[in-house]
């Protein structure tokens, strides 16, 4: 962590189609090499595919998926007297959101469909129904925290 000043939070604008800040953050996370228009077409294409397959509001599916992926607790390493303990700590809301977005994108990129639009659509639908590898990642994180509950008194 920096000893100097903390980085300022940047102001981001809501996305043009839905007017949602989280969708903009999601697009920025999907974006590679600064190609925002490509990221935009991937996200909106996936939302259209979700609308077609699930017959539900895509924004609702997206938010449900993020809620199902976001972890409540995680483990952090803490060194005490020569031993390193995995200490379970609560996750701050901003980090919860960031982890959910990151895990969703990673899981979508690992899927086997041909286009990123299809992969993202599949992962969004799976995550909104509490399935898929992004939800499994959250479950594994919670299991780790539960297994190390004995060290929770080392919190800082």
From Swiss-Prot:
GO terms for molecular function: rRNA binding; structural constituent of ribosome; tRNA binding. Keywords: Ribonucleoprotein, Ribosomal protein, RNA-binding, rRNA-binding, tRNA-binding. One of the primary rRNA binding proteins, it binds directly to 16S rRNA where it nucleates assembly of the head domain of the 30S subunit. Is located at the subunit interface close to the decoding center, probably blocks exit of the E-site tRNA. The keyword Transport does not apply. This is Small ribosomal subunit protein uS7. It comes from Rhizobium rhizogenes (strain K84 / ATCC BAA-868) (Agrobacterium radiobacter). Gene3D superfamilies: Ribosomal protein S7 domain. Part of the 30S ribosomal subunit. Contacts proteins S9 and S11. Belongs to the universal ribosomal protein uS7 family. The keyword Ribonucleoprotein applies. Signal peptide: none annotated. The lineage of its organism: Bacteria, Pseudomonadati, Pseudomonadota, Alphaproteobacteria, Hyphomicrobiales. GO terms for biological process: translation. One of its GO terms (cellular component) is small ribosomal subunit.
